[in-house]
Amino acid sequence: MEDCNVHSAASILASVKEQEARFERLTRALEQERRHVALQLERAQQPGMSSGGMVGSGQPLPMAWQQLVLQEQSPGSQASLATMPEAPEVLEETVTVEEDPGTPTSHVSIVTSEDGTTRRTETKVTKTVKTVTTRTVRQVPLGPDGLPLLDGGPPLGSFADGPLDRHYLLRGGGGPAATLSRTYHSSGGGFPDGPESRDIPSYGSLSRGLGVRPPRTGLLGPGPGDGCFTLPGRREAFPMGSESGPPSGRSLPEHFQAEPYGLEDDTRSLAADDEGGPDLEPDYSTATRRRPEYGRGLRARAFEDTADDAGELIEERPPFPAATAPLAQPERGSLGSLDRVVRRSPSVDSTRKEPRWRDPELPEVLAMLRHPVDPVKANAAAYLQHLCFENEGIKRRVRQLRGLPLLVALLDHPRAEVRRRACGALRNLSYGRDTDNKAAIRDCGGVPALVRLLRAARDNEVRELVTGTLWNLSSYEPLKMVIIDHGLQTLTHEVIVPHSGWEREPNEDSKPRDAEWTTVFKNTSGCLRNVSSDGAEARRRLRECEGLVDALLHALQSAVGRKDTDNKSVENCVCIMRNLSYHVHKEVPGADRYQEAEPGIPGSTTSQRRRKDDASCFGGKKAKEEWFHQGKKDAEMDRNFDTLDLPKRTEAAKGFELLYQPEVVRLYLSLLTESRNFNTLEAAAGALQNLSAGNWTWATYIRATVRKERGLPVLVELLQSETDKVVRAVAIALRNLSLDQRNKDLIGSYAMTELVRNVRNAQAPAHPSAHLEEDTVVAVLNTIHEIVSDSLDNARSLLQARGVPALVALVASSQSVREAKAASHVLQTVWSYKELRGALQRDGWTKSRFQSASTAKGPKGTPSSGGFDDSTLPLVDKSLDGEKSNTRDVIPMDTLGPDGYATVDRRERRTLGSDSTGDTSEKELLRPDPGRKAPPPGPSRPSVRLVDAVGDTKPQPVDSWV
C-alpha cells in the first residue's frame, strides 16, 4: 500500500512539474508578444504625431489607443499585432494560480490486512491553471517635486493606470498593489466613507507592481481610479482628483454612529416582513432625506420597567440632552433611536452641524397619531413616550393638545405594534404626581380599553405595559373603584391566579407549583394593593372575588418555602392581605354569629371595686390582695392555654374565610421572621393587628394562636427595629394581643423594657435615626397603658424598667399634645395602685407630680378641668367611623395620624395634594435606610416553629418565651 501511495505522489509531482514547465514556456511567449506590441505602439507614435494625430488606418489617435488598450486587456489577441523594434521599458508580471473547475481525479485503493481489517485510501488530484499576465510600463519623467509628469510626458503617460493624484502621492499614500483588471462592473451602491478610506492597503495575489489607487465605482460608472486605462484625451470626462458621487447640488448622506437617543437606548428593530405594510423611514423632519440603502424597519421596544420602581422625579430637562446617561428606571421611553444602523435620524451633534435637520414639534407628533400609515402611528407613539420621560411639561402639553384620546383610541388598533407603543406612551403619561392626566385617561375610556387589551394580549411585553399603566392609574383615588368595576376579574384570572401557582382543583399526585415573580404579577399586585385601600366596598369586592385570596396566600406560602420574602411582589401581596383583614370582624358575611359580649371599659368595674375597698377603714389592702390573687387564679383556671377549641369545619375554608383562620397566623409569623423588607414587616404586623382586633370568636383564637406559635418573642424582637413604621405596627399589634390575659402577662414581663426604651428615644434618641415620629410614640404609650391596666405585676415591671422618669420627662418636655396626654394617662394608671405608692414616694415621686402630669395639658394646651381621677380610662381621641372612642374592640387609629386605620398603607390614603412624595405605585423600590439598621440577622431573632402541637411528642410549654 505504501508503494502505491509513493507511486501516486510521484506521478502527481511529475504532472505538476510538467505543468509548470508548460506555463514557463507560455510566459516567455507572452513576454515576447508584449515586447512586439510595445515596439509597434512606439512606431505608431511617430507618424501619428506628424499626421495630425491619425494612425495608418485613419482612425483618431484616442480611438486607436483605446483599441490597443482593450487588446492588451485580452490575452491571446496580441498575436495579430505587427512586430516593432524594442524600446526601453519596465516589465511587470502578475501570476494568478486557479484551480481547474473540472472534477478532480481520484485514486481509490483498498487494502486488507492479515487480521481481517480493511483500509480504504482515496487520493484526489486537482489540476491547477496558472495564468500569467505581463504588461509593459514606460519610464515616466519626474517633475521638480519628484512626482511623474502626467501631462508633459509622452502620450502614453502612465501606461499602468489612469492619472495619479499628485496630492495623494505627496501625502505618501502607499496605495494597493493590484493585478490588471479584466472586467469592470458599474454599481450604484453606497458611497465610500471618505477620501481617507483609500489609504487602506489591499494586496493582489503574487503581484509585483507599482503602487496605484484602489478601484472605485460610483453611480456614474467607472472613473479614472477604477483600474482601467484612460488616455490623456479622455481625461476631460474625469477631472483631476474627481471622485464618484451623486449629481451636483445633492450632498452625500451623513453616516451616523449608533448612539443612545436621549436617556433610553434600544437595540431591537422591527422587520418590515414581521409586521407587513409599507416600509417607512421614521423621518419626522421637513427636509428631504437620502439613504444609501433600504433596510429593515425599526421597532423600538417599550421598556418594561414599571413606575413603582422610581424614586423622586428629577427636574425637568430638555427632551434631547446632548450627553447620554444610563438607562433610567422609573419610566422608560420606548425609543432608543428612531433609526438605527441602516436608517437613523441624525444625532444631536450632527443636527447642530446640519441646519436642515430639526426635531419634530409636539403638534406634529400628535398629528402623526392620525396618519393612515400604521408604522407612522407606531413610531409617533414611541417618540411621544420618549418625549414624556420625566418631563412634566410635555405631559401637560399632550393633555392640553388632546393627545390622550388619540392614544387611548390606538389601544384597539388591529396592529399589535401600534397598540404596544400607544400603551407605552400612556404609561409614561400616567406617571407622576399630576392627577390631571390620570383623570383625562379615565374620561376618554382608558381603563376599559386597557382591560380589553390585557384580555386580548398574549405578548408578555404588552401585558407588562398594560398592568404598569393600571398601577399608575390606581394611585388616583377616584379611579380605584373604576379599576375594580372594569378590571378586577380580569386582573385576578388573567394574572394573579396563573402566576401565583394556585390551582382550583390541584392534582394530588403533582407537586404544588411555585409562584412566578414576574413583572406582570408585580404590577398587578401593586394595582390591587392600591385599590384595596379605597374603602369598605372595595374590600368587599376583593374579598368576594373568586380565587383572589386563595392565590395570594398560596403565593406567600411559596415565598416562605423558598425563603424569597424580600421582593416587591411579596410586599404587595402582604399589603393586600392586611387591607382585606381590616374590619373583618364586622364586614364579612356571617360575622354576627361569632360576636362576643362587649367587654367593659378598662378598669371601670375593678376601679370602682378598688375605690370602694380603699374608702373602707378596715381591710382595704387585704380585700385588694384577695381580689387580685383570686382574679388571677380564676383567669388561669378558666381557660386551658395549652389547647385551642377551634370551631369544627365540615369542609376546608376558602375565599375570604381564609383571611381569619388561625392557620394564617403561622404564615405572618414566618414573614416576620424571614423578611428584611421593612414594608413587608410592617404589613405582616398590621395583619396580625387587624385579626386580633374586635370582639368576636375568631379574634380570640388568633390571639391564642400567636402565643401558641411562639409569635410574641418575634414581635418583641421587632420593637428593637430602628424603622419607625415597623415599631409602630408591632406596638399596636401587641396592644391588641394583650386583650388576652395570658398574653398581657407575658408582654408585661418581657416587652416592658423595649417599650420604655422607645419612650426614651422619643425624648433623647441614642442617634438621629432612632428618633420616633409622634404616631409611633403614641402607639407605644397606648400599648404600655393597656398592659399596665388591671395588672399590678405589669405596673411593677414598668417601675423596674425605669419607665416613670421617662414618662414624667416626656410630659414635661414634649411639644406634642397627644404624646403628653398619652403619657399622663399611663402615669395616672400607675398612681392608682396603692401598693406602688410607697415605692414611688421612696424614689422621690409625689402625688402632685402625677396630678400635674394628668392635668397639665389638655386639648390645644389648655388646662384640664376637674380634680385627680385615679380610675384607669383609655385615651380619648378622635373616634373612627362613628364608633365610641373608648371601645376596645378596635384601636383608635386616629391617634396614629390622619389616616384612620393602619391596615392600609398610609401613603395610599393621602390625598395627592398633600402628598409631596408621590403616589404609592410610584415609590422607589425598598432600599435599606443607611441611617437605620436592619433587624439583627441570624440566631439573635427567635425562629418561628411552624409545627403543630399535635405532632410534637414532647411539646414545650405554650407560654415559653424562648
UniProtKB/Swiss-Prot annotation:
Residues 95-123, 233-255, 268-291, 322-357, 593-618, 844-962 are annotated as: Disordered. Disulfide bonds: none annotated. Residues 878-887, 920-932 have a biased composition (Basic and acidic residues). GO terms for cellular component: adherens junction; cytoplasm; nucleus; plasma membrane. GO terms for molecular function: cadherin binding. It comes from the Eukaryota. It is found in: Cell junction, Adherens junction; Nucleus; Cytoplasm. The modification Phosphothreonine is found at residues 103, 105, 643, 872. GO terms for biological process: calcium-dependent cell-cell adhesion via plasma membrane cell adhesion molecules; mRNA processing; RNA splicing. InterPro entries: ARM-like (IPR011989), ARM-type_fold (IPR016024), Armadillo (IPR000225), Plakophilin/d_Catenin (IPR028435). Transmembrane segments: none annotated. Residues 777-962 are annotated as: Required for interaction with RNA-binding proteins DDX5, HNRNPH2 and SRSF1 and with mRNAs. ARM repeats lie at residues 350-389, 392-431, 435-469, 470-510, 528-567, 577-623, 647-687, 700-739, 740-782, 783-827. The keyword Repeat applies. Residues 272-282 have a biased composition (Acidic residues). Residues 103-115 have a biased composition (Polar residues). The keyword Membrane does not apply. A motif (Nuclear localization signal) lies at residues 608-624. The modification Phosphoserine is found at residues 269, 334, 337, 345, 347, 607, 864, 871. Keywords: Cell adhesion, Cell junction, Coiled coil, Cytoplasm, Methylation, mRNA processing, mRNA splicing, Nucleus, Phosphoprotein, Repeat. Belongs to the beta-catenin family. Component of a ribonucleoprotein complex containing mRNAs and RNA-binding proteins including DDX5, HNRNPH2 and SRSF1 as well as ARVCF. Interacts (via the extreme C-terminus) with FRMPD2 (via the PDZ 2 domain). Interacts with CCDC85B. This is Splicing regulator ARVCF. It comes from Mus musculus (Mouse). The gene is Arvcf.
